[in-house]
């Protein structure tokens, strides 16, 4: 996994798969490398301690070990009970789910058929050999965990583990595979051809349309428009992925940052996209390091949405999907960020995104929640509620999309469960005129989880579910569960080494 973090910042982190408790829900922020992970807060310490306590108490009642309990539906319920005890009743969960054998499993079984379309997933190519990535495990062996073996093994980020974590260990039905551009091509996770090849492989194996594909477009890079033409002709992506900030690792020395509303540079690409009928443009926004104003001078502005309104208005036939909800990762305490929201009603850059439809009179702007929701859910679920409320209020229920940024965070099932159970508190809804998120399979969450993406990608949900329910991956998952297979609860990013 590529990362923004400097050597000094890496010294303050540990690999999530070895440095954090394998809770059903992460008990501290896991960074995907695009931002600095906050130290574990006192509240998160309390949540972790309570989860461990319940696992020790309730595991024997279920006839399983602590590890077995934590990997079960009952363990997942226990994690949300613990979070409610610490943060207040933000998650819909009952004590019976954790305490009574079979109760949580029955609920999980009832929701297992839900249509979930994850529009942000990743893995790396088999021949990925960037020393900066392989060196993370070597560094971990030297500094964090001498017991690590096979430190040069990137299996956890590769194809087979991706299939297991996303399609077998979670309720995800359809996923969109993405990529990212870099000034140094040796950092490329997957080429456009490799993304398309993965789409062919998974759909051929499964016998259904399980995987969709991005093609990454890179304005200002040599030959970028020729690559667009080639992708339209031969790769035939389901949508496009762009990074207005250019290289997401470091401020581009090649000046590859750009604006969505650059009429001379980017509008000719939009013309080609409309003509080809590939009209969904996914854009990475937000998620900068803590010191972005100093470390990305003259570049960080390209991660904001200041360029979105005009482009969306000028190109009504295109759909602009802004990843991570444009949220800027906040390195101040969660309490301070929430206090600022309570005072002003605004969330930096995310509120700007949510206001664009009203300000510009457009209906073609969408927000994907990705890493933004994942980090909010584990550090301060009340803020997660504010974030979701802000996007739904401004963009509309039908323009917020589900994405997990997996496989960096392991199986996305914990994120799915967090969204299924999250509700915006009554007083927050009244003060900010937010709509309720509703039940796990209610109108709002059904739209977010899959209905909205299905509409963008021309997926007929009933037909898709019919095919998916009977495909090869569904059979593999059934056999896996019957044989006692369970989630690893592993995450693959970074966590802070110290507590707050």
What are these regions (language model features)?
Residues 1-64, 91-92:
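N-terminal secretory signal peptides
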Residues 3, 56-63, 83-121:
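C-terminal segment of N-terminal export signals and the immediately downstream linker at the start
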Residues 39, 125-157, 251, 289-294, ...:
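Active-site gating loops and adjacent loop-to-helix segments of metal-dependent hydrolytic enzymes
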Residues 64-84, 104-106, 115, 131, ...:
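Mid-to-C-terminal alpha-helical segments outside catalytic/metal-binding sites
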Residues 133, 254-402, 427-437, 441, ...:
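Catalytic pocket-lining loop regions of alpha/beta-barrel enzymes
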Residues 136-157, 164-187, 210-216, 238, ...:
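Divalent metal-dependent hydrolysis catalytic cores, especially in the metallo-beta-lactamase
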Residues 164-171, 192-208, 228-236, 272-275, ...:
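Acidic (Asp/Glu)-rich catalytic clusters
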Residues 182-303:
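Active-site gating/metal-coordination segments in enzymes
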């Amino acid at each position: 996994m590529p990362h923004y973090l400097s050597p000094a910042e890496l010294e303050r982190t540990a690999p999530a798969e070895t440095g954090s408790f394998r809770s059903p829900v992460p008990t501290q922020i896991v960074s995907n490398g695009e931002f600095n992970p906050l130290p574990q807060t006192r509240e998160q310490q309390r949540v972790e301690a309570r989860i461990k306590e319940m696992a020790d108490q309730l595991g024997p009642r279920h006839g399983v070990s602590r590890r077995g309990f934590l990997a079960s539906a009952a363990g997942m319920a226990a994690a949300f009970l613990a979070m409610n005890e610490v943060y207040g009743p933000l998650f819909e969960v009952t004590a019976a789910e954790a305490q009574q054998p079979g109760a949580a499993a029955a609920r999980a079984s009832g929701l297992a058929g839900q249509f979930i379309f994850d529009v942000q997933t990743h893995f790396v190519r088999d021949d990925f050999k960037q020393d900066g990535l392989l060196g993370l495990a070597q560094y971990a062996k030297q500094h964090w965990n001498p017991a690590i073996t096979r430190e040069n093994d990137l299996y956890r980020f590769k194809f087979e583990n991706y299939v297991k974590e996303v399609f077998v260990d979670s309720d995800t039905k359809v996923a969109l595979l993405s990529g990212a551009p870099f000034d140094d091509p040796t950092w490329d996770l997957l080429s456009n051809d490799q993304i398309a090849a993965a789409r062919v492989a998974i759909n051929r194996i499964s016998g259904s349309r399980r995987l969709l594909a991005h093609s990454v477009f890179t304005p200002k890079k040599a030959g970028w428009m020729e690559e667009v033409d080639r992708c339209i002709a031969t790769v035939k992506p389901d949508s496009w992925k762009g990074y207005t900030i250019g290289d997401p690792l470091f401020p581009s020395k090649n000046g590859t940052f750009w604006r969505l509303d650059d009429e001379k540079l980017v509008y000719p690409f939009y013309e080609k996209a409309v003509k080809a009928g590939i009209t969904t443009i996914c854009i990475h926004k937000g998620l900068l390091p803590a010191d972005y104003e100093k470390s990305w001078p003259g570049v960080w502005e390209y991660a904001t949405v200041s360029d979105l309104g005009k482009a969306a208005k000028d190109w009504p036939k295109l759909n602009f999907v802004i990843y991570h909800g444009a949220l800027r990762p906040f390195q101040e305490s969660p309490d301070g960020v929430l206090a600022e929201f309570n005072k002003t009603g605004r969330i930096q850059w995310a509120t700007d995104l949510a206001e664009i439809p009203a300000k510009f009179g457009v209906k073609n702007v969408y927000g994907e929640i990705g890493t933004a929701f994942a980090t909010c859910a584990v550090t301060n679920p009340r803020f997660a509620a504010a974030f979701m409320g802000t996007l739904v209020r401004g963009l509309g229920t039908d323009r917020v999309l589900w994405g997990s940024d997996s496989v960096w965070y392991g199986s996305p099932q914990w994120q799915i469960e967090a969204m299924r159970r999250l509700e915006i508190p009554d007083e927050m809804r009244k003060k900010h005129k937010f709509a309720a998120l509703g039940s796990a399979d209610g109108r709002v969450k059904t739209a977010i989880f899959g209905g909205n993406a299905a509409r963008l990608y021309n997926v007929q949900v009933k037909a898709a579910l019919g095919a998916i329910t009977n495909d090869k991956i569904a059979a593999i998952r059934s056999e896996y569960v019957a044989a006692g297979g369970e989630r690893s609860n592993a995450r693959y990013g970074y966590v802070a080494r110290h507590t707050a």
